[in-house]
């Protein structure tokens, strides 16, 4: 997923389909006070090969949900966003379900387009180390560009959260956990379109 910002900067991150035209990602992928707030354009690519060629088509995305407290306070407990695509590609490609029940020790994985390996899909596999509060902490490797990717449980093959990155003062990575409130929002937007 690539963003072009009002100040002319560009960036990329990872998102994942959770409905026919619904994409989940991290809020910090699609909102940046430093770059002018909201992106002037967001393009979603279902896949990119290692030569930089887009696999399939690209799709225009618009922000459907971005928590207000993330915008005003950079509240990391609200570091998630939902986007709407201009096509129901999930009906063809499929999409991830999600889970609100996660246990310490569950095997999990992250996939995304790591910044130092541009145009290559990378996966990190690890274990859930903590489920307390609003976050999941885990041992899977993450890198710039993988932000917004699903924290998915490998046995259930369901998303349990949104990858953020390194946890301050720890060797673990972390992301926002899909709790019942976020799951309700996801159900609402998935069924709205």
Residue ranges and their predicted role:
Residues 1-43, 128-131, 153, 175-176:
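Catalytic histidine site
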Residues 2-4, 18-20, 26-29, 45-48, ...:
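Active-site-proximal beta-strand/loop segments in catalytic clefts of secreted hydrolases
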Residues 3-8, 12, 31, 37-90:
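Conserved catalytic-core segment of clan PA serine endopeptidases
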Residues 9-12, 54, 119-123, 157:
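Short, mixed charged/polar active-site loops
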Residues 20-21, 104-107, 133-134, 155-159:
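Loop/turn elements at helix/coil->beta-strand transitions in domains of secreted/extracellular proteins
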Residues 50, 61, 76-146, 171-179:
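Chymotrypsin/trypsin-fold serine protease catalytic domain
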Residues 141-163:
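Catalytic nucleophile loop of clan PA
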Residues 160, 164-193:
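C-terminal cap/linker of serine protease catalytic domains
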């Amino acid at each position: 997923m690539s963003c072009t910002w009002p100040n002319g900067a560009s960036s990329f991150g990872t998102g994942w389909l959770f409905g026919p035209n619904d994409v989940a990602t991290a809020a910090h992928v699609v909102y940046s006070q430093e770059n002018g707030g909201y992106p002037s354009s967001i393009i979603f690519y279902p896949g990119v090969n290692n030569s930089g060629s887009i696999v399939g088509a690209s799709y225009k995305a618009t922000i459907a949900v971005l928590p207000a407290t993330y915008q005003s306070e950079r509240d990391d407990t609200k570091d998630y966003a939902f986007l709407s695509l201009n096509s129901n590609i999930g009906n063809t490609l499929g999409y991830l379900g999600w889970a609100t029940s996660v246990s310490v020790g569950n095997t999990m994985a992250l996939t995304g387009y790591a910044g130092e390996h541009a145009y290559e899909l990378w996966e990190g596999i690890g274990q859930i180390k903590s489920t307390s509060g609003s976050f999941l902490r885990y041992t899977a490797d993450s890198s710039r560009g993988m932000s917004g990717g699903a924290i998915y449980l490998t046995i259930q093959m369901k998303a349990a959260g949104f990858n953020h990155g390194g946890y301050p003062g720890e060797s673990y990575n972390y992301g926002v956990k899909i709790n019942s409130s976020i799951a309700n929002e996801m159900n609402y937007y998935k069924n709205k379109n």
